[in-house]
């Protein structure tokens, strides 16, 4: 059975939504949950019928969102340090954390090490499009990149799309300010030349192309990726609020909204980041799923499902093998 370490106290809202997410996941799929945190606080939240699937790893401290990620290695009593250490010692198959994302990334890189051929790991996230989903990476691990980093991100994203998203030939693109090969800054142009070696590379793409369903993997540096991610979250929230405001304007619009309620529900589900759970940190020697600090129980449940799928695949070995083809 898969063993998943969960940073049980690292999210913005404390342990309650995290434990609720773990319980929902256990009701859907069997796995062993290792809850990292204060067992005196956590144990009363676990129903007897699920106790057999729960273990505890004591951790007395939480790495604060206000702390610098570079300090994560210093305090070995934090929940995220203990969780990553369990993975390093191969006592678990994956880690899920809604805590400090910088600390998670820093500890995973330093404690677990990078995959062969990878110079920097990348955070990958799923973005909704009009057909299905687009994998965007990097979305925050590396604000400054070299062309070789983006090339490695492309390989990791392509393998992830193939193995986890089940896309046989994922269409891979590079984010730029125009589709033409000559567009972009020096980093983009140099990266484009490297990515031309990849058979599934379809060229440059603009930000709007994330949503048209014609791209499966979009590569960029962590600065641009994070700006895109946060902007999209804001736009989605604003659109639904504008719809609510318009619905309230008249009786007819309220009737129309009532008739459209099933469609609105489907749309909201498709665009809701909680449905996607978390973001895998690709390129480290293990499975680390980074969840949003504001994750509710549904997001934690879905992040755990991501961790299970990742752990059951051989994605890290496949990434190394794929990179080896280009480094030979």
Swiss-Prot record:
GO terms for biological process: fatty acid biosynthetic process; phospholipid biosynthetic process. Pfam families: FA_synthesis. It is an enzyme of class 2 (transferase). It catalyses: a fatty acyl-[ACP] + phosphate = an acyl phosphate + holo-[ACP]. Gene3D superfamilies: Isopropylmalate Dehydrogenase. Keywords: Cytoplasm, Lipid biosynthesis, Lipid metabolism, Phospholipid biosynthesis, Phospholipid metabolism, Transferase. Pathway: Lipid metabolism; phospholipid metabolism. Its EC number is 2.3.1.274. One of its GO terms (molecular function) is phosphate:acyl-[acyl carrier protein] acyltransferase activity. GO terms for cellular component: cytoplasm. InterPro entries: FA_synthesis, Phospholipid_synth_PlsX-like. The keyword rRNA-binding does not apply. Catalyzes the reversible formation of acyl-phosphate (acyl-PO(4)) from acyl-[acyl-carrier-protein] (acyl-ACP). This enzyme utilizes acyl-ACP as fatty acyl donor, but not acyl-CoA. This is Phosphate acyltransferase. It comes from Campylobacter jejuni subsp. jejuni serotype O:23/36 (strain 81-176).
């Amino acid at each position: 059975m898969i063993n998943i370490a969960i940073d049980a106290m690292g999210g913005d809202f404390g342990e309650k939504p995290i434990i609720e997410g773990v319980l929902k996941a256990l009701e859907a799929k069997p796995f062993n949950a290792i809850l990292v945190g204060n067992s005196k606080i956590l144990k009363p939240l676990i129903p007897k019928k699920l106790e057999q699937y729960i273990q505890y790893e004591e951790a007395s401290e939480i790495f604060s969102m206000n702390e610098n990620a570079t300090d994560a290695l210093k305090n070995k009593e934090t929940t995220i340090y203990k969780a990553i250490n369990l993975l390093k010692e191969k006592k678990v198959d994956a880690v899920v954390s809604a805590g400090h994302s910088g600390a998670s990334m820093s500890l995973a890189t330093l404690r677990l090490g990078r995959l062969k051929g990878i110079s920097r790991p990348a955070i990958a996230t799923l973005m909704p499009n009009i057909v299905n989903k687009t994998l965007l990476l990097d979305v925050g691990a590396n604000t400054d990149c070299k062309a070789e980093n983006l090339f490695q991100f492309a390989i990791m994203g392509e393998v992830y799309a193939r193995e986890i998203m089940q896309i046989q030939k994922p269409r891979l693109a590079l984010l730029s300010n125009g589709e033409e090969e000559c567009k972009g800054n020096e980093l983009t142009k140099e990266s484009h030349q490297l990515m031309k070696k990849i058979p599934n590379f379809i060229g440059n793409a603009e930000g709007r192309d994330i949503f048209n369903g014609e791209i499966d993997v979009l590569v960029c540096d962590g600065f641009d990726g994070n700006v895109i991610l946060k902007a999209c979250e804001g736009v989605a929230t604003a659109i639904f609020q504008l719809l609510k405001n318009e619905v309230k304007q008249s009786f007819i619009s309220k009737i129309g909204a009532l008739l459209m309620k099933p469609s609105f529900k489907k749309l909201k589900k498709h665009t809701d980041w909680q449905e996607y759970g978390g973001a895998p940190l690709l390129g480290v020697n293990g499975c680390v799923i980074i969840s949003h600090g504001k994750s509710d129980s549904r997001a934690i449940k879905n992040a755990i499902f991501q961790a299970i799928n990742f752990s059951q695949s051989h994605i890290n070995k496949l990434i190394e093998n794929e990179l080896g083809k280009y480094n030979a």
